Amino acid sequence: MRYLVFQLTLHGMKQRRRHFPRLKLITLVILLSAIIAWVAWSFWPSSARQMKRSVAIFTCQSWYEMVCKGKTILYVSDIATDTALVRPSLQQDSCVRTTYSTGVWVNSCFFIPSCRGRMVTVMTKPNEINRQDAWTLIEKEKERNQKRIRQLRDQLKELNYYLRINNVHDEGYNTVAAYAYEKEAEKAHCIRLAQLFDTVRKTDRPQLIRKAVYTAYYRLPNGECQQARMREVGSSKQCQTVLLQTVGRTTPTGVAPLSVFFVNGKSHGAALAVGYGGLGVKELASSDASCSIIPTTLHDNRHDLPAVLGGDGSPVFSKRGYFIGITKGNEVITRSQLRGLLRKEKQP
């Protein structure tokens, strides 16, 4: 009996030794297949359809809030280069400034699908305003507002004089009356601002805080337009690029994220760009724009793509479909610069 058990055990060991090389071979084949699939996925060029699905329209709705004693007392659309407050108002809706650019969905790691709603685009971020600078801006705006009130009063004197001496209510009279009404409303607005500025003291330590809402507009495979709220997770002041991510940290359905390889692509010759018509022109920009593939030519990482066909952030591909970079002005931001941006991602 013991001899029989011994023989059966010995036979089982021989069978396992015989199957062990076969198991190693199967494992090796599976591993090699996975590596080949990974290499093919990583380095396979984008098709025309994938190029179009890699982009979205990015909008930034921004404004400034003047905060005094923890309360918002004034809204400002922007701060001009001459430090003038642009369109100060007591209502937020009249101060929202919308800018457009092209956004590109990207993977954080080039060798695996790792988008999770990440997007790169071009956007100039203004410098933060400290309390001292905020008070200086308020003082200058207070002076400008008083000057504007004096100008409006002088204009209204002339307009009201014209209306008094002309009793015939013809078309010219009605036009002047409507213009005078607009100027009267503008003067009333400036007076309200003056009253507000008079209540602000330097000891109140007023602040000017920039607010922004980011949204990405993309299309499903059936052409239906969708939108996703975005948040900033990184930026490069030198390249004027921004890394964003969907609020839910998920990749939208139907998009085709691009992989940013660790070496730069071609910088000369014929290339292709994906652009939204009119997005690079302020008067034509719209979230309803459609993208198209446009031929362009590169020379030392510069392109000849007209702004009316593709604005900042438009992705550039080689003729074979390999991602090269994104546009900023007439330059192309390279893959290495974009990888530097990806490394600056802030952890939540």
Residue map of PLM features:
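N-terminal intrinsically disordered, acidic low-complexity segments at the extreme N-terminus
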Residues: 1-13
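Membrane-interface motif at the C-terminal end of an N-terminal transmembrane signal
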Residues: 35-47
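Conserved active-site neighborhood of the chymotrypsin/trypsin-like protease fold
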Residues: 111-130, 178-268
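Catalytic histidine site
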Residues: 44, 54-202, 313-317, 323-331
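Flexible, gly/ser-rich surface segments that form the specificity/activation loops bordering the active-site cleft
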Residues: 43, 92, 98, 221-225, ...
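N-terminal Sec-pathway targeting helices
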Residues: 11-32
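PDZ/PDZ-like groove recognition
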Residues: 347-348
